[in-house]
């Protein structure tokens, strides 16, 4: 009888890709295992649609993709941001129950587990109805996971964690070697309007799961991983990363060819790449400051610049229709020999290109892992979610990044941010980022971590062995 795992990712590209690539890894490592991935559509994220199409166009043996029925975007648009994903899964519970019921009744298949994104952990109730064990996938790092458990524990002890918002307190968090400034705490955990009670309820449910699988590796976050393992109230931890989509999403291949062709013409390690994630957009005044900082730095650049969602629209836009309307007058002409401004970018391919020597990033966890895998140092520009914390970890804990602004917050459901990072700061930090290896300790550390990341995924590496232990638990 074959064994089957059911995966339920959250419908945002950073969550979905990690779980699907993990499913492919599971299948490649265990010949008697099949995986069914249940995908819910999310109205804002065009990347989900593109990636989904690529999966259906290039199927993987023993990997089944099931698209759950689409729901009306109007069901979510007026909800507070913390309530959107819970609403998504609530609308899909009946469909998920029917799928699990049908699979558990099969005489040829044994359902060995449900692996749910942390945001969808409440689906555990349905898995329990069918005696299917639930495992949790954490798309963020071990440091963040430890912080969330710590804040949830404080909340359970009746400490008002919202008091940390806008304070100069430093917290002693078990998953961090250094005190964590309150200013880098994810706002969703300390904002009275941010749904922190609901989020902490998810981490309480996580403690009921069979195990937690994290997209990280021992050598990157040894302190955080060890702290989680030392806590008897946290389920077994399995770091199995870095799990990355190294082949891209299969879309925009013509645009990718143009971008990579331009990089082919640049000297090695000469280009700084700017990309701020699926929801990383700026107001016009900030765009102009970035442009001036880039121009003054004198470095070659590739800049992924994407517009905010237009009023009345529900989907992110891939690029501006007219760049001259938002950039400084004459910028494109003056920098035409050294720079290229684009919309969508094939991020992993760009980071892996020998011409790229630095990455100005929003510090999403997937982007962090990609920069490590490719050995490209980062200048941190965190914007939303847990990215401020990721930036702090990269700069202070790991020493693999240059700090620009770790307190910049531009929450993707509230783009009205008055804080401006000035051109002078951007110029200075880009110059520091692009220093050669002889003069840059950060660049040396990133190159070392690149080798460690690849060893972790190789036979008998730390993540390879961690996955083997997880199979023993599941099978």
UniProtKB/Swiss-Prot annotation:
Name of the protein this chain belongs to: UDP-glycosyltransferase 101
SUPFAM superfamilies in alphabetical order: UDP-Glycosyltransferase/glycogen phosphorylase
UniProt binding sites for UDP-alpha-D-glucose: 345, 347, 362, 365-367, 370, 386-387
Entry EC no(s): 2.4.1.363, 2.4.1.366
Residue numbers annotated as active site: 15 (proton acceptor), 117 (charge relay)
Domain of life: Eukaryota
Family label: Belongs to the UDP-glycosyltransferase family.
Record GO terms (molecular function): UDP-glucosyltransferase activity
Biological pathway: Secondary metabolite biosynthesis; terpenoid biosynthesis
Broad enzyme group: transferase
Biological role stated in the UniProt entry: Component of the dammarane-type triterpene saponins (e.g. ginsenosides or panaxosides) biosynthetic pathway. Glycosyltransferase that catalyzes the biosynthesis of ginsenoside F1 from protopanaxatriol (PPT) and the conversion of ginsenoside F1 to ginsenoside Rg1. Triggers C20-OH glycosylation of ginsenoside Rg3 to produce ginsenoside Rd. Mediates the conversion of protopanaxadiol (PPD) to the ginsenoside compound K.
Keywords for the protein's UniProt record, in alphabetical order: Glycosyltransferase, Isoprene biosynthesis, Transferase
Annotated positions binding an anthocyanidin: 15, 385
Keyword Transferase among UniProt keywords: yes
GO biological process, one term: terpenoid biosynthetic process
């Amino acid at each position: 009888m074959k064994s089957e795992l059911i995966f339920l990712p959250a419908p945002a590209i950073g969550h979905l890709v990690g779980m699907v690539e993990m499913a492919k890894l599971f299948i490649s490592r265990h010949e008697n295992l099949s995986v069914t991935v249940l995908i819910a559509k999310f109205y804002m994220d065009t990347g989900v649609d593109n990636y989904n199409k690529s999966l259906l166009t290039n199927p993987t043996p023993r990997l089944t993709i099931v698209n759950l029925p689409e729901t009306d975007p109007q069901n979510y648009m007026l909800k507070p941001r913390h309530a959107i994903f819970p609403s998504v899964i609530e609308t899909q519970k009946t469909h998920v129950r029917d799928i699990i019921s049908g699979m558990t009744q099969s005489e040829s298949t044994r359902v060995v587990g449900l692996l749910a994104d942390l945001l969808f952990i409440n689906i555990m109730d349905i898995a329990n109805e069918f005696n299917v064990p639930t495992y949790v996938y954490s798309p963020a790092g071990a440091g963040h996971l430890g912080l969330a458990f710590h804040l949830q524990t404080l909340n359970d002890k009746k400490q008002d964690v919202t008091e940390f918002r806008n304070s100069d307190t430093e917290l002693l968090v078990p998953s961090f070697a250094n005190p964590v400034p309150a200013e880098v705490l994810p706002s969703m955990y300390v904002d009275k309007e941010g749904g922190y009670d609901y989020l902490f309820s998810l981490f309480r449910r996580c403690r009921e799961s069979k195990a937690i699988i994290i997209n990280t590796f021992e050598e990157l976050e040894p302190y955080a991983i060890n702290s989680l393992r030392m806590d008897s109230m946290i389920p077994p931890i399995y770091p199995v990363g870095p799990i990355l989509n190294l082949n891209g999403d299969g879309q925009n291949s013509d645009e990718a060819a143009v971008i990579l062709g331009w990089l082919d013409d640049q000297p090695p390690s000469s280009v700084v790449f700017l990309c701020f994630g699926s929801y990383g957009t700026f107001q016009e005044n900030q765009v102009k400051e970035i442009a001036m900082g880039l121009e003054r730095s004198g470095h070659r650049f590739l800049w992924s610049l994407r517009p905010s969602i237009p009023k009345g629209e529900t989907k992110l836009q891939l690029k501006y229709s007219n760049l001259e309307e938002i950039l400084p007058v004459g910028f494109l002409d003056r920098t035409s020999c050294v720079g290229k401004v684009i919309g969508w970018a094939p991020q992993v391919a760009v980071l892996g290109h020998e011409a790229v020597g630095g990455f100005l990033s929003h510090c999403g966890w997937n982007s962090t892992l990609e920069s490590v895998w490719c050995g490209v140092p980062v200048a941190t520009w965190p914007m939303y979610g847990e990215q401020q914390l990721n930036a702090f970890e990269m700069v202070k804990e790991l020493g693999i990044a240059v700090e620009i602004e770790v307190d910049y917050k531009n929450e993707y459901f509230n783009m009205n941010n008055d804080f401006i990072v000035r051109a002078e700061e951007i110029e200075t930090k880009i110059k520091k980022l692009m220093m050669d290896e002889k003069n840059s300790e950060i660049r040396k550390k990133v190159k070392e971590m690149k080798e460690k990341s690849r060893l972790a995924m190789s036979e008998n590496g730390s993540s390879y062995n961690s996955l083997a232990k997880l199979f023993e638990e599941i099978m």
